[in-house]
Amino acid sequence: MQTCLRAARRIRHLVPFVAWLLAGTPALAADCTPRDLPPYDAAGKGGWAHVPLSKLKRDTKYAPAKEDGRSILKATAEDAASAFVHLEPSDPAKRPFLEWSWRVPALVEKADNRDPKKEDSPARLIVGFDGDKTTLTDAEQRRLSLAKKASGRDAPFATLMYIWSNRDPVGTVIPSAHSERLKMIVVESGAGGVGAWRNYRRNLAEDYRLAFGAAPGPMLGVAVMTDTDNTNAKAEGHYGPVRLACPAPAGK
């Protein structure tokens, strides 16, 4: 029984920040058109929403701001973890590219994403995907069932988490210690880019295949998260606008 309760608590930590979960299969656009996600100050207006992870954890503080004429989000975590989430149904086969930027003033000194006791990051961008959960292992289905009972929400079929790592090389895929259906991909490593805005363009379909060995199902939503609840440290993360983009036209 204690083992089941510990498993429920571990997976419950992952469920709330994927509050993008939808009933049934999301409606998808027939053709590819770029999609700029709403500005961060659209929270509560069909835009972004703050999602706590647990009543036992402090919340990361998220504050929309303006910098260089654009909408950004400033996240401040002090022994804290929570997320800023936006529901966004999309088909990675038709609109495969995810573009965003972020800036961190400093790394989380003791963070190590391979160690569940030190698994923090100054910047994360998280993407949830739908899929057929009956194909998952019995153990994973039990974890998801426990998570639903604990949180009142379904968990996504799979989750990609783009992170800034202290030491793992860019391109490294790190399995989560909490769930086989969550994989972290390192897109920035070390202190070389600290203090500067860093820009990213990731192919969701390719990254999903790299992490899970299959084509992705529909995208359910996106979240950003700065967390320090495991290292009890303080960190900041500044997030620029998020965009879903199309492949370049043939010949360009």
Predicted regions and their residues:
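Short carbohydrate-recognition loop motifs
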Residues: 60-82
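Extracellular/luminal beta-rich ligand-recognition
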Residues: 120, 124, 130-178
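Extracellular beta-strand ligand-recognition surfaces/modules
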Residues: 122-125, 180-190, 194-232
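Extracellular carbohydrate-recognition regions
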Residues: 29-55, 138-143
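Secreted extracellular polysaccharide-interacting domains
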Residues: 75-95, 106-110, 179-188
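Extracellular beta-strand elements of beta-rich domains used
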Residues: 222, 242-244
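Bacterial N-terminal signal peptides
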Residues: 12-25
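N-terminal secretory signal peptides that target proteins for export/translocation
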Residues: 1-11
